[in-house]
């Protein structure tokens, strides 16, 4: 005969967040001793977290608070849309914004519910039963920041997040720029930000390709510059054709709106 009641199981589940069968087994092992059962579940949870640490967490969500954006990972999209997981991510994002977190280490160290975020994460991992990970954080400088969050599916949390720092009064134009970054994945704001070694490499590739195609020697300089310009259109936000007005560049659209883009940050779940 069991030396515990259904009420004991319910209470233990409420306190620990463990599953019903785990609670029953813990109470049986503890011979009905409630505190001992809690200890058993805590030890089991710690062991399970250790096992989960070897698994991959490639799903998750992007959360934003103020000028700060974070990525929190889980193993499955089922957990990624779990309300408790989402609430935890929002709390961490708010704490990260207050701390202006700019790295994984700074993200793990922010305080949530009286403890470090990384410790709170481990507890949630034990409760949910999946490996969870605080992946990264970034904070963008600026008095005005436009935010765009993209959902891959209506029932899932945001998988792509973009922050765009800007000057000007047209928030809609800045938001459109953020949507552009989300969709076309610009790497740089302008061609001035592209590293010199990257530009040199692109020139080499353009020249080698043109020679392989048998282009005339005297035409090479113009061909190289044209292909370099095409590269900038691919990777530089201001040089890209606008998704809202395809005959204009993003810079032209922003200039007409009286908006100056100062910088941007883009996160996508599972991407570096």
Curated annotation (Swiss-Prot):
Residues 76-79 are annotated as: Involved in Mg(2+) ion dislocation from EF-Tu. This is Elongation factor Ts. GO terms for molecular function: translation elongation factor activity. Associates with the EF-Tu.GDP complex and induces the exchange of GDP to GTP. It remains bound to the aminoacyl-tRNA.EF-Tu.GTP complex up to the GTP hydrolysis stage on the ribosome. It comes from Corynebacterium jeikeium (strain K411). Belongs to the EF-Ts family. GO terms for cellular component: cytoplasm. It comes from the Bacteria. The gene is tsf. NCBIfam families: tsf. Gene3D superfamilies: 1.10.286.20, DNA helicase RuvA subunit, C-terminal domain, Elongation factor Ts, dimerisation domain. It is found in: Cytoplasm. InterPro entries: EF-Ts_dimer_sf, Transl_elong_EFTs/EF1B, Transl_elong_EFTs/EF1B_dimer, Transl_elong_Ts_CS, UBA-like_sf. Keywords: Cytoplasm, Elongation factor, Protein biosynthesis. The keyword 4Fe-4S does not apply.
């Amino acid at each position: 005969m069991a030396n515990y009641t259904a009420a004991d199981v319910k209470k233990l589940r409420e306190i620990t967040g463990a599953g019903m069968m785990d609670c029953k087994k813990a109470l049986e092992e503890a011979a009905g001793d409630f505190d001992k059962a809690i200890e058993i579940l805590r030890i089991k949870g710690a062991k399970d977290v250790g096992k989960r640490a070897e698994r991959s967490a490639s799903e998750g969500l992007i959360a934003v608070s103020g000028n700060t954006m974070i990525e929190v990972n889980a193993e499955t999209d089922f957990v990624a849309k779990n309300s408790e997981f989402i609430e935890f991510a929002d709390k961490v994002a708010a704490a990260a914004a207050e701390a202006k977190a700019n790295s994984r280490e700074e993200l793990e160290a922010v305080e949530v519910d009286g403890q470090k975020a990384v410790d709170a994460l481990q507890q949630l991992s034990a409760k949910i039963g999946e490996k969870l990970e605080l992946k990264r954080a970034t904070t963008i400088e600026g008095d005005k920041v436009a935010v765009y969050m993209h959902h891959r599916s209506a029932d899932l949390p945001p998988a792509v997040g973009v922050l765009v720092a800007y000057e000007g009064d047209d928030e809609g134009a800045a938001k459109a720029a953020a949507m552009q970054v989300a969709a076309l994945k610009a790497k740089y704001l302008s061609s001035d930000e592209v590293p010199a070694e990257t530009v040199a490499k692109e020139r080499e590739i353009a020249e080698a390709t043109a020679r392989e195609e048998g282009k005339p020697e005297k035409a090479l300089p113009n061909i190289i510059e044209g292909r370099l310009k095409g590269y900038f259109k691919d990777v530089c936000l201001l040089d890209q054709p606008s998704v809202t007005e395809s005959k204009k560049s993003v810079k032209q659209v922003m200039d007409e709106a009286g908006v100056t883009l100062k910088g941007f940050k883009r996160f996508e779940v599972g991407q570096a």
